[in-house]
């Protein structure tokens, strides 16, 4: 699925809205995404603060619907998805689900990188450096 960029005139400014799922799926997932934004983990909050810094130089969205998924973070311009994995991602079934999810998103042209909660919280500089390398 391609990313469609639709521009709409919002007063004097023109803003961009990104459609990354079918309209029906997007409308369903956006409600879950909104809820997720209000209940972020400590690691997700920490990474969001990193991604919002001017040092990052690219715009990221958090809890964004793509296809059948809600990704933790995405830079649409660079087609980079960042997932922050909690402890349950070490469970065999979740690892298989994550593999399928990553493969599906990769087949759609996205690069998916993953960090554990511990990596984000204990090594934020390393996480930022890794993200910057992926963006360049």
Task: Please provide the spans of the model-predicted regions.
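Basic, amphipathic alpha-helical patches used to engage nucleic acids or provide basic targeting signals
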Residues: 36-40, 46, 62, 67-135
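Solvent-exposed, charged helical/coil patches
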Residues: 1-58, 107
């Amino acid at each position: 699925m391609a990313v469609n960029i639709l521009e709409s005139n919002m007063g004097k400014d023109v803003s961009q809205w990104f459609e990354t799922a079918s309209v029906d799926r997007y409308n369903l997932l956006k409600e879950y995404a909104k809820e997720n934004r209000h209940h972020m983990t400590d690691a997700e909050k920490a990474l969001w603060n990193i991604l919002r810094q001017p040092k990052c130089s690219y715009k990221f969205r958090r809890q964004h619907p793509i296809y059948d998924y809600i990704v933790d973070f995405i830079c649409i311009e660079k087609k980079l998805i960042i997932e922050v994995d909690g402890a349950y991602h070490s469970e065999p079934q979740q690892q298989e689900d994550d593999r399928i999810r990553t493969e599906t998103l990769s087949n759609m042209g996205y690069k998916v990188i993953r960090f554990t909660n511990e990596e984000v919280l204990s090594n934020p500089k390393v996480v930022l450096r890794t993200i910057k390398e992926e963006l360049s």
